[in-house]
A protein has these predicted regions:
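Bacterial Sec-dependent N-terminal signal peptides
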Residues: 1-20, 477-480
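Long, intrinsically disordered, low-complexity segments
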Residues: 12-14, 109-112, 187, 208, ...
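An aromatic- and glycine-enriched ligand-binding surface/loop that stacks and positions planar moieties
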Residues: 13-81, 160, 183, 187, ...
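Conserved, well-structured interaction surfaces
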Residues: 30-31, 35-36, 43-49, 75-157, ...
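C-terminal substrate/ligand-recognition segments
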Residues: 91-96, 342-430, 579-601
């Protein structure tokens, strides 16, 4: 048997893996060679059209928090099936030009699954895991990475073929499989993997967030349980599973236990909100902090800052790339935060770095109300020797797949839903809020959220939004909660109100007032209650029309923008079709009939 080997690396290395004629026995009985097989799974994450350039930039848009900022929502473009807009606007065709290729994310995910299948089979046969903890760790990693990929396949495509054995003559063509069956395999696999994987820093292998630890295995199992027990689009409509083994209470019980286990182990700690993202941008992969696992992009791969970072209009003192700002927050998100919430000014950024350079340096300048950037990922937070030597497109910053704040909030959600115990649930929400808000405001939220079960659930919905905006968890959360239609309609109304400075946004000034202090911009007019009279009286400040085009007077948040957020009913269009190229090569076993080809039972 020919085994594909990749170099032993801790990040995705995009050099083509070498081919070896070593037999399966030799590869999977030696730790270093078996480890190479685990690393080869990472390569599939990082291919050009896999997570790097297709799944991470597009899955998760549009939500009630996140949208395109470079290419913006557009009803007219979505209705004419513009490739990018229709991917976001809940009306995607199987022939989409961004996706309908043989090397797209759908194919790369199955490539990663095949590599995981080979590793799982080989290590089980020849790894002697009962006598070798490190080989057992590798088996746990393979099981976990396969579960991760399958979970993302289901999020995007729903019922998909279940390839759980290496490819052979008997499984070349496979139909869709009910996702419930896959979920049950994943939950069982992850339970097994828990027995194999080390806790963070328990072993040299798990000293890095680029390697799977028991904390991540448990966290992923909790996340998958919440998806399995929640709503999704099926062949007969948008509903929860009918399988009693995946009943919501059973899935919440799994999520509760797994999350509480992670927290009680004390192997991971919450630092400050900003610290987490600075460490991410600086390639600090030391385990034990907030990060549980990251997609390990190599220095020459990955478009995290390119896609989700603050826009730089030119190569400047911080980066050799004129990138960033492709995706950003919906314009109202900034105004929905409490003004004292430290997450607001880290998550939502109204400025960019200038194209014009002064003494070779750019400076911050206002963008537009329809062009906000995310601020969790920044070239200016990267190590300068790295950021100033980047190629045209890739920045090499890892994608943080899960962090400890998610574990705390999943625990809080599960305890509220399962036990109807708001006081205990609050104990798991509180650490996330303590680092974000002043103590008095945390206490006020406690009174609001712990009033009853519904109030606490609404608090979870609200705080997961404020905590994870820009991390692309929101769309899947809205789907599993069964509220995606409600929240997306609310998003359109909020955009309409913001455009007209009405409703919750009626107390905002028409203009923003700003000045530069060195390279940094100082802005007045972004807080509720700020006024144009006060702004105009500020010494040394310039002003900019924020809501309307300064030349035409037309609203920048146009009807085309607002209605472009979604054009199909979100709950019935929350999946992508399997791309046409794969349908045509499926020997008639795959289709997108009905609700995107989904099964009813």
């Amino acid at each position: 048997m020919s085994i594909a080997l990749a170099g032993v690396v801790t990040s995705c290395d995009m050099d083509a893996p070498t081919q070896s004629t070593l037999d399966e026995t030799s590869v999977f009985s030696q730790y270093s060679l078996a480890e190479s097989e685990i690393m080869s799974i990472h390569v599939s994450f990082c291919q050009t059209n896999s997570y790097r350039g297709r799944f991470l930039p597009y899955y998760g848009l549009n939500s009630d928090l996140e949208t395109g900022s470079g290419t913006q929502p557009s009803y007219s473009k979505a209705m004419s099936y513009d490739d990018k807009n229709s991917l976001w606007a809940y009306n995607t065709l199987a022939t989409n030009g961004q996706m309908n290729t043989d090397n797209n994310a759908y194919a790369m995910f199955y490539e990663g699954i095949e590599r995981a299948n080979l590793a799982i089979q080989g290590i089980r046969k020849y790894g002697h895991i009962e006598n070798n903890r490190d080989m057992a760790q590798l088996l746990g990693e393979a099981l976990t990475l396969r579960a991760l990929i399958y979970n993302d396949l289901i999020k995007a495509w729903g019922d998909v073929p279940a390839r759980l054995q290496p490819n052979n003559a008997d499984n070349v063509y496979m139909p869709r499989c009910n996702r419930d069956s896959i979920y049950k395999v994943l939950l069982a696999d992850l339970k097994e993997a828990e027995d194999y994987c080390y806790w963070p820093n328990e072993n040299v292998i798990t000293k890095s967030t680029e390697r799977v630890s028991k904390s991540f295995v448990k966290g992923l199992r909790a996340r998958i349980a919440l998806y399995a027990g929640g709503y999704g689009l099926r062949g007969d409509g948008y509903r929860k599973s009918k399988d009693p083994e995946l009943a919501s209470d059973k899935m919440y019980a799994i999520a509760k236990q797994e999350c509480v286990d992670i927290i009680n182990q004390h192997c991971n700690t919450l630092g400050s909100f900003e610290e987490n993202f600075k460490k991410l941008c600086q390639d600090n992969v030391a385990a034990g902090g907030e990060s549980l696992w990251e997609i390990p992009f190599a220095s020459g791969r990955g478009r995290v800052v390119y896609t989700y970072g603050i826009k730089h209009q030119a190569a400047d003192q911080y980066t050799s790339q004129n990138q960033g700002g492709a995706n950003g927050p919906l314009p109202y998100l900034y105004y929905d935060y409490d003004k004292d919430d430290i997450r607001r000014d880290i998550t939502c950024i109204p400025y960019e770095w200038s194209k014009d350079l002064v003494d070779g340096k750019s400076y911050q300048q206002l963008r537009g109300i329809n062009k906000w950037c995310f601020g969790k990922y920044r070239y200016e937070w990267m190590k300068s020797e790295r950021a100033l030597s980047l190629g045209k497109n890739d920045d090499g910053v890892n994608w943080q797949y899960m962090r400890l704040a998610d574990v705390y909030l999943m625990a809080a959600e599960a305890i509220n839903a399962l036990d109807n115990d708001q006081q205990t649930a609050w104990k798991y929400m509180k650490p996330v809020l303590d680092r974000a808000l002043p103590a008095a405001k945390v206490e006020a939220l406690k009174a609001k959220y712990t009033a009853n079960q519904e109030a606490f659930f609404n608090g979870i919905v609200e705080q997961r939004g404020f905590e994870f905006a820009g991390e692309m968890l929101r769309k899947a959360d809205l789907v599993r909660w069964g509220i995606i239609d409600e929240k997306m309609a609310e998003a359109k109304q909020k955009l309409t109100d913001l455009s007209n400075r009405a409703g919750s946004y009626k107390d905002l000034p028409l203009k923003l007032y700003y000045k530069n202090e060195g390279e940094n911009i100082v802005i007045y007019g972004l807080n509720h209650g700020d006024t144009d009279a006060e702004g105009a009286a500020l010494d040394g400040y310039s002003s900019k029309q924020w809501f309307v085009d300064s030349k035409t007077g037309a609203n920048l948040l146009t009807e085309d923008y607002i209605n472009g957020l979604y054009v199909g009913k979100p709950s019935l269009n929350c999946l992508w079709p399997i791309w046409q190229t794969f349908i045509e090569k499926s020997n008639g076993l795959l289709n997108n009939d009905g609700n995107y080809g989904q099964l009813s039972d």
